[in-house]
Amino acid sequence: MASIKLDGAGASKMKTLEEALVSLQTIHGIVERMAMDVQNKKGVGVIPMQLKRIAAPLVGQLKGQFGMIADQISTMLLVAGRGGGDQVKVRAYREHVAQVRTAMETAQKKVTRDHGVEIELAPE
């Protein structure tokens, strides 16, 4: 029976993606909290600043190996600086989070395909 193991470069890329997914989950939680505040007609307060504070290091983390995903996150940060209503911002944040998550999942599959090495497992 064969199994797939990642080579060194693949393991490094996969570790970067897994850490980035944890940060993205945090961002998603903040966006949903912002959506609840907007729905309840409360002010969003410092939530856009929290998003910037979490997403900016994520851009730096991904820039070296996954530049296109980092660019998508940078675009998401630009949404925070634009004018417009909070509902429009929430919608844009949700769309960007979904795009980034899809891009990360696609990148994980690509890393597995490109850096996967088949190993033979011993029979039981």
Predicted regions located by residue number:
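Alpha-helix N-cap/helix-start motif at coil-to-helix transitions, marked by capping-box chemistry
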Residues: 18-25, 45, 49, 67-71
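Short acidic, glycine/proline-enriched loop segments that cap or flank alpha-helices
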Residues: 38-46, 61-68, 84-91
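Short, well-ordered alpha-helical segments
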Residues: 50, 61-79, 91-96
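Long amphipathic alpha-helical coiled-coil segments
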Residues: 73-85, 102-105
